[in-house]
């Protein structure tokens, strides 16, 4: 890994960690909260590994004071969390003041600790009542989302500066409506492309409303990205396979937001599923409302081919319920293992992919728009089975984060405007269809006692945040930065 400027990051670089409401909060039936699509989906036989759910999760709802103190001890400058639509507007309609009060207390605790709240309005927990009316396949949900956004701003707008509308709408649309591996568990490609468009419309409507309320707010969007490479660059079919995955994963969201249009090739690919029929007269001008930042979630890239046998593209959890491809127009496209190390999710570890992605985003999207980038999620699941003196020695996760932060440094040195990095995740939590089988946290959670214990990666990350630089260490050694946390 190339290091620039003695491992230092730009002045003001934001160090944080991220979670999501359903994954950490628990308190699923308290203070007026009602079912989200994930509560419902978790009850479907075979949908989630071990039939687990977020009823208790990490109990962040009751332990957020302890958790904020932990964040402060880790030198975090920002905490990226999501508000639960099912807690704030439980039926999709009337506001539940008790639900908003939780986020008000959390925000006050964060500000009291000197930690910037980084709020995400939607991280996949649509109220079940709205799903019963069609969910994201129903255009009306976009307008209900804008109303929900304003109800959150009513209470938190005086204290929260950074507002993210959606987290990873690709997952909401295509894992939720095409593959069926996420809530609401549908497998209908036409519904998936409808959800895609309505999610983007929801983003644009909420961004417009929030900026109309307060033009000084930082309003942005978080997208997950892949880097799709043809397995054989000299094979036109493999080149087309990479184009299809890039189009249906990356460009289908980034192009409307930054260019005000869907890519022509993607529209052609998806023509059988009717994407164009959902685009209203003013929709693309709403969707391309200027934003103040782009959040980038990156975990891995992939080499793709149209030559079987190879691996299926989806790495769905081994739940009993059958799933389908999340790509409406990539039948016959496969993933090709490249011999790279992999995480416990089976995802290849490819930090140079993040470097390439950031260069591309700066060149094609954010640079021309004058919009900064933040890494809003990056991290890895590993076994965490090496424990010394009660501390998880997660050297593999530490090295994963270190390598990807190095890729960020390389991108910054190449002129990319990256202003912060949020580790995924602050703590082990409910990993969607995987249940509690996969641990992404830099803090270990004992799911019986709910005790939190910082892992070696957390201690290393705390030192990086304190010094605004990559800590120097001997190869194979985790740094002893306990003193900096006391």
Language-model features: where?
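Catalytic domains of carbohydrate-active enzymes, especially glycoside hydrolases
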Residues: 63-84, 289, 293, 364
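A common structural microfeature
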Residues: 12-14, 61, 78
